[in-house]
Curated annotation (Swiss-Prot):
This is Erythronate-4-phosphate dehydrogenase. Substrate binds at residues 45, 67, 259. NAD(+) binds at residues 147, 233, 258. GO terms for molecular function: 4-phosphoerythronate dehydrogenase activity; NAD binding; protein dimerization activity. Catalyzes the oxidation of erythronate-4-phosphate to 3-hydroxy-2-oxo-4-phosphonooxybutanoate. The active site is at residues 209, 238, 255. Homodimer. Pfam families: 2-Hacid_dh (PF00389), 2-Hacid_dh_C (PF02826), DUF3410 (PF11890). It catalyses: 4-phospho-D-erythronate + NAD(+) = (R)-3-hydroxy-2-oxo-4-phosphooxybutanoate + NADH + H(+). Its main location: cytoplasm. Keywords: Cytoplasm, NAD, Oxidoreductase, Pyridoxine biosynthesis. PROSITE patterns: D_2_HYDROXYACID_DH_3.
Length: 376
């Protein structure tokens, strides 16, 4: 069995090595010739999976995408050919939620404007938006959720209109899929008028899809509104972001919010489980067996951390400033965006860091944030 796989997917060999011949490829430049005799195709969001790619292949048994979204996959085409498909919903939700939360802590420290006491509006209450809300609520932050689709489906959580969210939120974090048409279109959801209407000193974070924000309009808005603070992990025109936009962001990264070691491993692992199910063979591997030990055994707390100390704990796990510096130095180089993604050092999630503290009830919120070993 030939398994064609994006070369940037981790843990492919230990998970799939016993199932067939693994053929690593560049996902962004994948050609029909490279997949014409594949039995299994494993991709990420950089690969367009459609008739143009797969028409020459008559033996494909399974397509898997180690992603939350599926907008890069022609699902109707696969269904029409009877090719099973699976993605990995929620695989990197924790990573994105923690990235957004850490970015807010970093902004709070940079501008001496505590996160505690602010109101955060989350646009899109799916996996990543919910994970962001979980972090914020664990820390005691008021969260407003906007998701008209979830609301219409009967989701029991309380939702507000986008207009209410824009009026009340001090911080806005975007977590919607890209939808280009229809009643709930998200393409350029944040256009010039909407961004100009934001409250003074709003923080705007985009960790979903670059074109949810009109990037050209964002440049115009920032030229008029220095009070608007930006965290941009995604960009219109990826892998070629607008060079003039980058300096306007307080933190800028190359679409790596979901790039935790746990999240990336979880995405590959979910596809492994699905393929084993399809082949009717037992899934004998375990996710926990793949992850290396964290470089800190534990951090002992003498007292419950304040916001400054919480940021330091977060930096033990992931220092956003490092990725920001790498991005600014490398995004304009030839293939710089994709090279940074490919070579990104795998950060860990909060769960990798064990905290020891005698008064456990005072730090239950750290457990809810995701840190392990809290209390003793």
């Amino acid at each position: 069995m030939k398994i064609v796989v994006d070369e940037n997917m981790p843990y492919v060999e230990p998970l799939f090595g016993a199932l067939g011949e693994i053929i690593p490829v560049n996902g962004r430049t994948l050609t029909p010739e490279q997949v014409q005799d594949a039995d299994v195709l494993l991709v990420r969001s950089v690969t367009r999976v459609n008739a143009a790619l797969l028409d020459a292949n008559s033996k494909l048994k399974f397509v898997g995408s180690a992603t939350i979204g599926t907008d890069h996959v022609d699902l109707a085409y696969l269904a029409g050919r009877g090719i099973p498909f699976s993605n990995a919903p929620g695989c990197n939700a924790t990573a994105v939620g923690e990235f957004a939360f850490i970015a807010m802590l970093e902004l709070a420290a940079r501008f001496n404007s505590p996160l505690k006491g602010k109101v955060v509006g989350i646009v899109g209450a799916g996996n990543t938006g919910s994970a962001t809300a979980k972090c914020l609520e664990a820390y005691g932050i008021k969260v407003l959720l906007n998701d008209p689709i979830k609301a219409a489906e009967g989701d029991p959580r309380h939702f507000v209109s986008l207009e209410t969210l824009l009026h009340e939120a001090d911080i806005i974090s975007l977590h919607v899929p890209i939808t280009r048409t229809g009643e709930h279109k998200t393409l350029h959801l944040f256009d010039e008028a909407r961004m100009m209407s934001l409250k003074p000193n709003t923080w705007l974070l985009n960790c979903c899809r670059g074109d949810v924000i009109d990037n050209q309009a964002l440049i115009k808005v920032k030229e008029q509104r220095d009070d608007l603070k930006l965290v941009l992990d995604v960009w219109e025109g990826e892998p070629n972001p607008m060079p003039e936009l980058v300096p306007f962001a307080e933190f800028a990264t190359p679409h790596i919010a979901g790039y935790s070691l746990e999240g990336k491993a979880r995405g590959t692992f979910m596809l492994y489980q699905k393929l084993c199910e399809l082949l009717a063979i037992p899934a004998t591997k375990r996710l926990s067996e793949l992850l290396p030990p964290f470089h800190f055994k534990a951090v002992e707390l003498e007292q419950a951390p304040d916001e400054k100390a919480l940021l330091q704990l977060a930096r033990f796990v992931y220092d956003l400033r490092d990725d920001d510096a790498v991005f600014r130095n490398g995004f304009a180089r030839s293939n710089g965006f994709d090279t940074m993604r490919k070579n990104h050092k795998h950060r860990r999630e909060f769960s990798a860091l064990a905290l020891a503290y005698h008064g456990q009830s005072e730090v239950d919120w750290l457990s809810n944030l995701g840190f392990s070993g809290v209390g003793r």
